Regions:
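Glycine-rich phosphate-binding loop and adjacent beta-alpha segment
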Residues: 164, 212-282, 316
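C-terminal hydrophobic helical "lid"/dimerization subdomain
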Residues: 265-316
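Glycine-rich beta-strand-centered segment in the early N-terminal region that forms part
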Residues: 21-39, 48-86
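NAD(P)H dinucleotide-binding glycine-rich loop of Rossmann-like/cofactor-binding domains
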Residues: 56, 78-140, 181
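Short, glycine/polar-rich helix-capping loops at beta-to-alpha or helix-loop-helix junctions
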Residues: 87-90, 165-172, 237-242
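Short amphipathic alpha-helix with an adjacent loop that forms part of the alpha/beta core around
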Residues: 188-199
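Mid-domain Rossmann-like dinucleotide-binding core that forms the NAD(H)/NADP(H) cofactor-binding site
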Residues: 114, 118-186
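Short glycine-centered segments of the SAM/dcSAM-binding site in methyltransferase folds
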Residues: 78, 135, 159, 225-226, ...
Length: 316
């Protein structure tokens, strides 16, 4: 079968289109003929060797796939699934506990871009204990998790503020119906948030950029505000000032989806709710770009440029 391999850590150029044996079946796993593959920033971190607990070269990257199960508990069904790695391939072994038949309302490309983004967004909002009419600010709002979080928060009655890095993405967010859109390139973007929020602060911030934005987050949160950190796209984890946390009784939560996947029961309950939203078309993954598997390096370059929106998909 055709795969993408990482034989040494490095930039997108280390992604090699090559041949590999089809995986042998194992108990508790289903072999899936892959129709579409979700590209995540975690894939880039694995490629560079910066993903916590990530694989050593040589390996096949890729965390989520959609396709037809040819063996396992879901044999014959179209499923989406999460794998430890190995998704950038024509066939993938998917744990039965992390494979979910998907409704006809989703295309294969949308299914491949569903699990990581929507589960991350779901757990982030659950950790934040989002309530109707609360003010939610999403950093990197045009990305996969950002768009998923906005769709879910809209169902929960939140007032949503989105931060994005370019005029083009800001316009796209406005056209998608986001209530408040602010460009992070604007020197006074914090003032813009304060103005649009009525000056009384933000209840919840979903943070995936890291670095200097952490200090801005703490300035924007109102007393008893909640900061949910699920990434550091800037490459700089940043620092939190305890004095700022104490001053306004702020709380900080960290979210790493991989750790939450250790509870299949919790994931199954979350997916029941998310898939019902999908059936009712209350949530729909936004596909920003589709590349052939052989062009995985170009997909990584686009993702790392931060010029993309929604989800990037590979097709075997």
């Amino acid at each position: 079968m055709k795969v993408i391999t990482v034989e040494s850590y490095g930039g997108p150029e280390v992604l090699k289109y090559s041949e590999a044996p089809t995986p042998a079946t194992e108990p508790g796993f289903g072999l899936v003929k892959v129709e579409a593959i979700g590209v995540n920033f975690a894939d880039c971190m694995m490629r560079t060797g910066h993903y916590p607990g990530g694989p050593q070269p040589a390996f096949v990257p890729g965390l989520e796939v959609a396709g037809i199960a040819v063996s396992g508990a879901h044999q014959g069904k179209r499923i989406m699934g999460i794998v430890e790695h190995g998704g950038y391939a024509e066939y993938a072994l998917v744990p039965d506990a992390l494979a979910f038949p998907y409704p006809t309302e989703l295309s294969a490309e949308q299914a491949a871009g569903f699990l990581v983004t929507y589960l991350t967004a779901y757990y982030a909002l659950w950790m934040a204990d989002l309530k109707p009419d609360e003010k939610l600010l999403i950093q990197a709002a045009a990305g996969g998790v950002g768009t998923a979080a906005a769709q879910l928060a809209r169902q929960m009655g939140a007032e949503i503020f989105g931060i994005t890095s370019s005029p083009e993405k800001a316009e796209w967010l406005r056209q998608s119906g986001l209530e408040h859109v602010i460009e992070s390139s604007d020197y006074n973007y914090r003032e813009a948030v304060r103005e649009q929020s009525g000056g009384d602060g933000i209840d919840i911030i979903l943070e995936s950029v890291g670095g200097a934005t952490l200090a801005a987050d703490l300035e924007l949160l109102r007393p008893l505000g909640r900061l949910i950190v699920y990434g550091a796209l800037s490459g700089d984890p940043g620092h939190l000032h305890l004095g700022q946390l104490f001053a306004n009784s702020l709380s900080v939560h960290a979210l790493h989806l991989r750790s939450l996947l250790q509870s299949p029961e919790s994931v199954s309950m979350a997916m029941d709710e998310l898939l019902e939203y999908a059936r009712r078309k209350k949530v729909q993954p936004v596909i920003g770009a589709v590349y052939p598997l052989a062009e995985a390096a170009e997909a990584h370059r686009l993702l790392e440029s931060r010029a993309s929106y929604g989800k990037i998909i590979l097709k075997p």
